[in-house]
Structure formats: structure tokens, C-alpha cells
Amino acid sequence: MYKPLFSLFVIICFSCSSEHNQIESILKDKKTLIKNVYQNKEKHNLQILYTQIEKDSAGNPKFIEHHFQVDDRKYFYPASTMKLPIVVLTLQRLNELRNESFNINVDSRISISFNETKREEETFKDLIAKIFLVSDNSASNVLINFLGYNYFNEQMRKIGLSNIVLNHKFNPDPFVNNNWNIKNDENKIISSSLAQTLIEHKKTSNLKQGKAHISNGDKTKSPLDFRFKNRGSLRDLDGVIKRIIYPELFDEKSRFNLTDEDYNFLRYWMSRFTYEDIGRDYTKDSIYFDSYNKFFIYGDITSSIDKKIRVYNKLGQAYGTLTDISYIKNYEENVEFFLSATIYVNDNEIMNDDVYEYENKGIPFLAEFSRQIYQFEKLRKH
């Protein structure tokens, strides 16, 4: 397990230096798409957190944060970004089970059943790979059954990420209401109770969104209420990925209980493109292009991509909100930085009607903005 090399060493820039204004200088770019989003930043609930990584002569890193409209108290729907901490805690829980003398690891085959319904046996590795490659809802929901809501929320609070709250599973999934019974290959039950203390998001704004919403096929002329939906603030979700990439920068009580092998496993799957590893099975379907599940850098590119630039990430897309939490690195040119952002693109203000400006506004914005940050980092490092 990781030992603390030194206490948390994070520098956050609040001054108005030229570099601090780099986010706004890009947002004010002449490119029409970026400028239009910036001019309507409140409407788009735009939040951006960009972190530079500086290293001293010995290679010790420190973080320098730049932020734009980041507000822990202003709600946005995190969607599938919640799957990142779910996967992390799954690996942590496997470590705990091994300490309790269970013979289990990511490659162990598990049986998954509910009443008369039985899924094909899978491994935790299979489930996690599906989550990172194609954001599989069903795989994520099995892991929620493995962890339990209360365990998840307690662990988030424990390491100082209390603005990440899990209240429900992911849809669409035909088996979303199944309380899966999970057993290891020794036929021992390893799933958790889904009994939960439902957490209401108090002291949080923007919990009612839209002018109308669709429910069970009918349009209701009232906002959609997110008080009991999943929650993840941009800063805390960004904190998850920072703990994965640079765990040594966090003191022991603020880290996940993971091994070096766990961290390497996470980094591998977070950075895969769809055409790599078992992802090749998905590329037979035209919707799963090479950079599927990557908004930053490649989001608006469905053709060949620059393999030198790796994006370690988990994105979310639902209810008109797009979010990406990422660490971006070019190993050949030694460029690396963290970038997390969320944007709301729902011009008609009707929630759950599947009419959102993802393809013509949200995704192109995130892709182009991140490329601009990348170019800035590239120039800064050389």
C-alpha cells in the first residue's frame, strides 16, 4: 500500500496572474463556439477546474489550480462520472475482503443472480473494463450491489469527498431494480445490502432544473427535482482522479486503501481507447468509434486519433449536462495536466426529452477548449 511520502503539498492560485487568467483568455477566444458559451456561462452552468503539475529538480510534483465558476454548492447532475469512485471503492472493498480471508481478486469469476434471473458469470475486471470503455450501466449497477449505498457514501465522507453522494443506480438498465446476489467462486455471498440512508442535498442551489420534464412519457410543466439524485461536485470528482494519479500527494487518511497494483490497473483502463484491448469487441458497432467515452481532446473526432496523447478519464452525459473528469498526458513531450469541466446544454429547458445540444455545442466545446489548454501546456513546458 502507498505510504505517505510527504504531507499534502498543493498550491492553489487565487491571484490574478496571467496564467490564472488562462481559462478566461481561452473562453474569450475568437472561435465562435467557445466565445458563445462564455457569453452565456450562467445559462450553461459552466464550471472548469484546470490543474498544472509542476515538478522540482528531484521530480516531486505539486499542483497549481485554476478555476472558473467552480461552486461546490451549485448542483449539476454528475451522471456516469459517479462510476469512477464506484470502481475505485470496488477495488478497495476487494482488498478488505481479502483481509477477511476471502479468496478473491479482480480476476475471480463471480455469479450474479436475482430470484430466477441469472447473469453470465463475469470477473470484476470484465465489469470494470466495460465501465471505462463504454460506460456500461448494468456493470455499474452490479458493483453498486457489491458495495452498497451506505458503504459508498461513508467512504467518500471518510476521505474528505463528502460532496460525492450515491443515492440511486443508473438507467437505462432492464435489471435496474434487481438486488443482485453476488457470490465468489467459493459460493460465498459478497454482495452488500442495498438498505440505505437516502441523502437529501441541503445547502445546495440549482436543485430544480428546466421549465418542464418528461415522466413516464408525459410532459409535466414543472422543473425536474434533483434533491435525491446522485451528486458529485466538480472539485470532489476531480479529487478522485488526483488521488488515482498522484496518491502520494495526499496524507493517509485522505487516500483510498489501494495497492500499487490497484492504481496501475485503474490507470490502464481509464486511459484505454475503444479500439484497444477487449474494446475491440465494441468497435464492430458504429456508435463505438475510437475515442468513444472521451470528451476532452477527441470528443468531436470520430476518425483517427493522436495516440501520443492519453486521456485518463470518466465522463458523464444526462439531462442536458456533460461532464468530464480527466488527467491528460503526452508521454513523448512530457506534457501533463488535470482538467475537469461541466456544461449544461438544454436550450428548450425540457428535461428528459432527449433533445439536447450535445453534438453541436457541448461536446465540440469541451473538445476544443481542452485542445486549447493542451496547446498552452505544450508551449509552457518547452
Language-model regions: role of each:
Residues F76-F102, L339:
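Active-site SXXK
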Residues K28-V70, L339-A341:
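A short, well-structured edge-of-sheet supersecondary motif
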Residues M1-S25:
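Bacterial Sec-dependent N-terminal signal peptides
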